[in-house]
Amino acid sequence: MAHTLPPLPYALDALAPRISKETLEFHYGKHHQTYVTNLNNLIPGTEFENLSLEEIVKKSSGGVFNNAAQVWNHTFYWNSLSPNGGGEPSGALADAIKAKWGSVDAFKEAFNKSAAGNFGSGWTWLVKKADGTLDIVNTSNAATPLTTADKALLTCDVWEHAYYIDYRNARPKYLENFWALVNWEFAAKNFA
């Protein structure tokens, strides 16, 4: 089965000025598309040819895994953002964040510290553990919670291509602006 680039849940310029249209043109239109294209070139005639994206991520390794996981990770990232995002979580998710970190601000500080310290290229995730508690997890390269017992709630892409056009090498500045775009509704649905 051929995989396709999922549509963005908003217009290319909808996250500006925090994430520019130019960044999305490259990040979504080039990087994300390339992972889809590479995956489609790698799977014909293999055991992965007719599997869903999630099944491929869970069962593959090497180039197939890297491209499939990056398709999944990026799609999750786009949904973790919203032009109407920001603010604070509510309900059960807010309660779980406060139970773990004491406050939403303390959580954001811990997340930013983790993401800023995520060496090289990767992802920083808010995850729900098997016991129902929350945690912040860094993954490198294409690694994803999808291959673990953790349930991803939201993610921040800390590959340089996610922020270099807008913030150059200032990852902490990108992280500061990330919170104004966070889609807490998406995170809450994943938590439920």
From Swiss-Prot:
SUPFAM superfamilies: Fe,Mn superoxide dismutase (SOD), C-terminal domain (SSF54719), Fe,Mn superoxide dismutase (SOD), N-terminal domain (SSF46609). Fe cation binds at H27, H74, D157, H161. It holds the Pfam family Sod_Fe_N. It catalyses: 2 superoxide + 2 H(+) = H2O2 + O2. One of its GO terms (molecular function) is superoxide dismutase activity. Keywords: Iron, Metal-binding, Oxidoreductase. It comes from the Bacteria. Its EC number is 1.15.1.1. Binds 1 Fe cation per subunit. Its cofactor is Fe cation. Destroys superoxide anion radicals which are normally produced within the cells and which are toxic to biological systems. Homodimer. Belongs to the iron/manganese superoxide dismutase family. This is Superoxide dismutase [Fe]. It comes from Bordetella pertussis (strain Tohama I / ATCC BAA-589 / NCTC 13251).
